[in-house]
Regions:
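Active-site-proximal alpha-helical scaffold in enzymes
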Residues: 89-102, 164-175, 181-214, 250-270, ...
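ACP-dependent fatty acid/polyketide chain-elongation machinery
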Residues: 1-75, 263-275, 370-385, 423, ...
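Acyl-CoA/ACP chain-elongation machinery
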Residues: 37-43, 206-241, 245-246, 279-293, ...
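Short, well-ordered amphipathic alpha-helical segments that serve as non-catalytic structural scaffolds
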Residues: 88-100, 167, 261, 294-310, ...
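Conserved beta-ketoacyl condensing-enzyme motif
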Residues: 9, 33-182, 215-221, 313-331
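Active-site pocket-shaping loop/turn-to-helix segments
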Residues: 23-24, 71-91, 155-160, 181-193, ...
């Protein structure tokens, strides 16, 4: 493996509630737009509850120039089931590939790393519930064996597709990508682990280009679980680091980023958004839903990213925080930041994007760094929405108004996920 190889970003594909594609997303970011809706959930025709969500409006997979025959093949394989999260993923990949201007048709030089927490799970749960109810209603004396056979008959394909390699397969086949491939599921930090994996693949010389992509389409079942843990805000507004923070809400979305060997990018005169400098990662191995507040794993991940990037804390211009908006996670994150950068510092600037786009779960870190890199190229730091008063106990300052500055050159993206997956990555602007 050559540590001297440089890896750069040559294409981005954001898809979320504030836009489809880099231009629409950036314009919404500058104007502090959001699209939060109250989603009503039903089982059959029975109303079971409502939850706030950052919704993608007017999404149509047919608008992205993806081969119609391939889309029909996927639809047939999925037996006409709802496959929105896969469509989000495919749309994001197409946006990024087109943006990169790379020839991706049948490339053995291009790899693919995909992230998601549980593709197809919500649809599968609904299918099992609906069919179980109909079977039981039609025959209340049914044996357990007969019940199993009937459920298996209607749900076996859906169950098979819960295997994450199928999500990767559908994506790679759609775009004829034949290089290194991997599916990453490290909770909220999946996107950062995926980026690091892609970078190491390029540095090892296995592929010149690797696409990293992810998506999530959270629904009522995830809301019931996480809401039951007290993690979802009641008013629909995520308030990161605020004194009155009370949880998050979900956001539809997907994202893709094209990572490329620097020399290869230069040889084809590709546009370079930014360069990957380094990453740091730790695993707490403590609790599933709580961070290890008594330890310093998150801080260690950040320090590792700075060391690998060969920059000191004062060389970071922007911190893009996880900013989940919950009491304990924001406290844990703030402590990791202040342990390294000090208390109530003016620089680096701290921002976070969940108030704009919601929590995209398994794809949140990837979506957020993609949007942050778009903003970085535009010399813009978005303000933290809904944070009228920072919790003084956190001892940090956040960006309250949008900042334009050509001095913004490096960004540190940090994420702490369920299960104790902590990640931090550093990028620098492509023209510096």
């Amino acid at each position: 493996m050559s540590e001297n190889k440089r890896v750069v970003v040559t294409g981005v594909g954001p898809l979320c509630s504030i836009g489809q594609g880099k231009d629409e997303v950036f314009n919404s970011l500058v104007n502090a737009k959001t699209n939060i809706e109250l989603e009503k959930a039903y089982i059959g025709d029975q109303y079971i509850g409502s939850f706030y969500k950052h919704k993608i409006k007017d999404f149509d997979i047919n608008n992205f120039g993806i081969d119609k025959q391939r889309l029909n093949e996927i639809k047939d394989w999925k037996e006409d089931e709802e496959i929105t999260d896969l469509y989000f993923l495919l749309a994001s990949i197409k946006l990024a590939l087109v943006d990169s201007k790379v020839d991706f048709k049948g490339s053995k030089e291009m790899g693919l790393v995909v992230t998601h927490e549980n593709p197809g799970l919500e649809q599968f749960i609904s299918k099992v519930i609906d069919n179980s109810f109909e079977i039981a209603k039609a025959n209340q004396e049914i044996t357990k064996k007969d019940f199993f056979n009937k459920i298996y008959e209607v749900c076996n394909r859906s169950a098979y597709d819960l295997q994450t390699f199928m999500f990767l397969f559908h994506s790679a086949k759609t775009f004829n990508l034949h290089g290194f491939s991997l599916f990453v599921n490290n909770a909220c930090a999946s996107g950062l682990f995926a980026i690091e994996t892609a970078v190491q693949t390029i540095k090892a010389g296995k592929n010149k280009i690797v696409v990293v992509a992810g998506s999530d389409y959270p629904g009522i079942y995830k809301h019931i679980w996480l809401g039951g843990l007290g993690l979802c805000t009641k008013d629909g507004k995520i308030k990161p680091f605020a004194k009155n923070r009370d949880g998050f809400i979900f956001g539809d979305g997907g994202a893709a980023i094209v990572l490329e060997d620097y020399d290869h990018a230069i040889s084809r005169k590709a546009h370079i958004y930014s360069e990957y400098l380094g990453g740091g990662f730790t695993l707490e191995s403590w609790k599933v839903t709580l961070p290890a507040v008594g330890d310093s794993f998150y801080r260690e991940a950040i320090l590792k990213s700075l060391k690998e990037s060969r920059i000191k804390p004062d060389g970071v211009d922007v911190i893009n925080a996880h900013g989940a908006g919950t009491g304990i996670i924001d406290q844990y994150e703030a402590r990791a930041i202040t342990d390294i950068f000090g208390e109530n510092f003016e620089k680096p600037f701290i921002t976070t994007l969940k108030p704009y786009i919601g929590h995209n779960l398994g794809s949140c870190a990837l979506l957020e760094i993609v949007i942050q890199l778009i903003a970085l190229e535009k010399n813009f730091i978005p303000p933290v929405l809904n944070c009228d008063e920072v919790d003084p106990k956190l001892k940090i300052k956040v960006v309250k108004e949008g900042i334009y500055s050509e001095d913004i050159k490096t960004v540190l993206k940090i994420t702490c996920g369920f299960g104790g997956y902590d990640g931090a990555v550093v990028f620098k602007r492509g023209d510096v």
